[in-house]
UniProtKB/Swiss-Prot annotation:
HAMAP family found in the cross-reference section: ATP_synth_delta_bact
Underlying gene: atpH
GO molecular function, one term: proton-transporting ATP synthase activity, rotational mechanism
GO cellular component: plasma membrane; proton-transporting ATP synthase complex
Assembly information from the UniProt record: F-type ATPases have 2 components, F(1) - the catalytic core - and F(0) - the membrane proton channel. F(1) has five subunits: alpha(3), beta(3), gamma(1), delta(1), epsilon(1). F(0) has three main subunits: a(1), b(2) and c(10-14). The alpha and beta chains form an alternating ring which encloses part of the gamma chain. F(1) is attached to F(0) by a central stalk formed by the gamma and epsilon chains, while a peripheral stalk is formed by the delta and b chains.
Function: F(1)F(0) ATP synthase produces ATP from ADP in the presence of a proton or sodium gradient. F-type ATPases consist of two structural domains, F(1) containing the extramembraneous catalytic core and F(0) containing the membrane proton channel, linked together by a central stalk and a peripheral stalk. During catalysis, ATP synthesis in the catalytic domain of F(1) is coupled via a rotary mechanism of the central stalk subunits to proton translocation. This protein is part of the stalk that links CF(0) to CF(1). It either transmits conformational changes from CF(0) to CF(1) or is implicated in proton conduction.
Similarity comment: family membership: Belongs to the ATPase delta chain family.
Organism listed in the record: Pseudomonas putida (strain W619)
Main subcellular location of this protein, as a coarse class: membrane
Protein name: ATP synthase subunit delta
UniProt keyword annotations, A-Z: ATP synthesis, Cell inner membrane, Cell membrane, CF(1), Hydrogen ion transport, Ion transport, Membrane, Transport
Topological category with respect to the lipid bilayer: Peripheral membrane protein
KW Transport (keyword) present: yes
InterPro entries, per the entry: ATP_synth_OSCP/delta_N_sf, ATPase_OSCP/dsu
Length: 178
């Protein structure tokens, strides 16, 4: 995984710098998201791995599948990625691009998993508190998991806050073992 990220980083950085210079971050994010989805299709994966096809043929087919969703610069990006046999890295490239975009926008995606559904007021309060703690705008994504028993688990990048009953029981069990 780290190797894929290392290989994808220069492409994501180049796309980000181009998009930022032309004030097209949202467009490029959408285009790369589409490219990532297309590259993960089983049929497309077989085509991209086919040794008998040239990089130009792979790029042309990829661009044809995406239709008019790609502007000229995005099509060139796909051609360059194909020339260097990096089309299979498009999911990693898109993820890194979105990470750079979030850093630029001073925002962070936060996954909140709770034992019970959070209403909008609770989500708003939680987003406000997390925004103050993280010093960034928070985009909250809430989900439910009854296995937590109670409480919440918050994931923001590398930060994980486990305030669930299940997490506390696991910590207590670990403490009793030692």
């Amino acid at each position: 995984m780290a190797e894929l990220t290392t290989l994808a980083r220069p492409y994501a950085k180049a796309a980000f710098e181009h998009a930022q210079a032309h004030q097209q971050l949202a467009n490029w994010s959408a285009m790369l998201g589409l490219a990532a989805a297309v590259s993960q299709d089983d049929t497309m994966q077989r085509l991209l791995k086919a040794p008998r096809l040239t990089s130009a043929e792979k790029a042309a087919t990829f661009i044809d599948v995406c239709g008019d969703k790609f502007n000229a610069q995005a099509q060139n990006f796909i051609r360059v990625a194909a020339e260097n046999d990096r089309l299979l890295l498009l999911p990693e490239i898109a993820a890194l691009f979105d990470l750079y975009k979030a850093e630029q926008e001073k925002s962070v995606d936060v996954e909140v998993t709770s034992a019970f559904a959070l209403n909008q007021e609770q989500q708003d309060k939680l987003a406000k508190v997390l925004s103050a703690r993280l010093g960034q705008e928070v985009r909250l994504h809430a989900s439910e998991d009854a296995n937590l028993i109670g409480g919440v688990v918050i994931r923001a990048g590398d930060l994980v806050i486990d305030g669930s009953v299940r997490g506390k029981i696991a910590k207590l069990a670990e403490a009793l073992k030692s």
